[in-house]
Amino acid sequence: MEYDVVIIGGGPSGLSTAIKLKQLDSNLNVCLLEKASEIGAHILSGNVFETRALDELLPNWRELNSPIKTKVKKEKFLFLGKTKSLSWPTWLLPAVQQNHKNYIISLANLCRWLAEQAESLGVEIFPGFPASEILYNEDGAVKGVATQDMGIDKDGNKKESFEPGIELLGKVTVFAEGCRGHLGKQLIEKFELNKDKDPQQYGIGFKEIWEIDDKNHEEGLVMHTAGWPLDNSTYGGSFMYHAENKQVFLGYVIGLDYKNPHLSPYDEFQRFKTHPAIKKIIEGGKRISYGARALIEGGFQSLPKMFMPGALLVGCDAGTLNMPKIKGSHTAMKSGMIAAETIHYHFQKGDDLSVYDKIFKESWLYKELYRARNVKPSFSWGLILGIIF
């Protein structure tokens, strides 16, 4: 199967790439592969969303029945001791950590809605088809991907339901797999995209969705915490977002550069939920969903080159998360939009994909990540100094 553009991954960056491509040229044949059974099935819900990229991509999103409904109405930041908590005035927090213009959303629902917008423009979306292999031309340029064979038993034998994988060929292939995408890692190594860059850094994030008692629910509340149960030298903290329908998105992030070999991130999350400031909110509630994900935290200094012959990297496949904002959806979307502009220029002018670098450096995304470049490294001095920095 041949297309103008093949996109791997149905998250914010991949879907934004697809939408922008069709906006720029409705005649392009664009397909998007998603490994999950449906768009959003592998997205951990719960997100404080900055609409900057969406305002550019779909300026009329408010009229398109989007799932973006719950505005942030109130913020709290707590330093936790073992049993006590100290409330930090939110007006003392850096502007990048203030959320009064943002929304509490389900990221999975946002992706489902973006998929609807993409399909309405003519994008072909194939859920349930994980890309398993990168295909190359004789000159070494990426020419597409192959999906994995289906109907293989545990011993590698073909079952009656066997279906061979398919090759999807594109003039350009966009990799939008998310953090540590297995194909993206191969490309970074093969094309030395991280040459002269700082080593990438990672964290692990746990997220749960709770349905809590009405008396404990405050729709529009965003709360973050730092401190207990982690020590001052370990990077990490929590978030709690009060969404609609008495739901709370509760999560905990720990940097994987922690020094204590006995530390268990999962157990620290469980301890965190026993703190009186947290327990009083979720007590009597019901956990209805949970999961964990790797997070890419290296920031600006660790960003690999995002273009190579025949392909582009976008979103967390490259590492566009803004750590001080604790946000990556709007940056992932913008990186996908830049990829679409690059591809459009490439098809119009015949230049190679290196123009991505020029468009990226002229964008607000580059400026935002550049301004945030030293925040994560500052936490090597300890929690308090890192927050002050």
Label the predicted regions.
Residues 3-31:
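N-terminal Rossmann-like FAD-binding beta1-loop-alpha1 element of flavoenzymes
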Residues 86-107, 116, 144, 253-255:
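Helix-loop-beta segment of a Rossmann-like dinucleotide-binding subdomain
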Residues 58-75, 128, 194-202, 353:
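A short alpha-helix-loop-beta-strand transition element characteristic
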Residues 35-83:
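N-terminal FAD cofactor-binding segment of flavoenzymes
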Residues 292-323:
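FAD-binding beta-loop-beta segment adjacent to the flavin cofactor pocket
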Residues 104, 317-330:
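Glycine-rich phosphate/pyrophosphate-binding beta-alpha loops
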Residues 319-325, 341-384:
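Active-site-proximal substrate-binding core of FAD-dependent oxidoreductases
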Residues 108, 117-278, 338, 342:
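Predominantly flavin-linked oxidoreductase catalytic cores and closely associated redox partners
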